[in-house]
Design a protein with these regions (language model features):
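Bacterial signal peptide processing site
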Residues: 23-26
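C-terminal motif of bacterial Sec signal peptides marking the signal peptidase cleavage site
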Residues: 18-21
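The canonical Cys-X-X-Cys-His
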Residues: 36-47, 98, 102
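Gly/Gly-Pro-rich "capping" loops immediately C-terminal to redox-active cysteine motifs
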Residues: 30-35, 50-75
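Bacterial N-terminal signal peptides that target proteins for export
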Residues: 1-11
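A generic local structural motif
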Residues: 2-4, 28-30, 44
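Processing junctions and N-termini across compartments
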Residues: 16, 35-38, 77
Length: 108
């Protein structure tokens, strides 16, 4: 029974982090793919895209999962599963820049 409570608490913490958007964003608005990733994505997906609360994105993994860039943009924009929607929090230009960064430069 105790194991079930601990697992439930861990799940609740994970959902809270996901609902909070997996990142903060400082006082200045990030404009480049790496800046946007660091500010909004790295908390869940890891500094180098190695994964954590969210799945691994680096090393080409995300491009394999979403061969069509527009499919990945749709997930970031609208959310999917535990991935929160970034519509209204990031501009379409910021979303495109961070997706391109994740697909091409993120080490993994």
């Amino acid at each position: 029974m105790r194991t079930l409570r601990v697992a439930g608490a861990a799940f609740a913490v994970a959902l809270t982090v996901a609902a909070a958007g997996c990142g903060g964003g400082g006082s200045s608005t990030p404009t480049t793919g790496p800046e946007i990733y660091k500010a909004y994505c790295s908390t869940c997906h890891g500094v180098d895209g190695q994964g954590g609360v969210g799945p691994e994105l680096g090393g080409g993994v995300v491009a394999q999962k979403y061969p069509n860039i527009d499919d990945q943009i749709a997930v970031v924009t609208n959310g999917k599963g535990t991935m929160p929607s970034w519509r209204g929090r990031l501009t379409p230009d910021q979303i495109r820049k961070v997706v391109v960064y994740e697909r091409t430069k993120l080490p993994g």
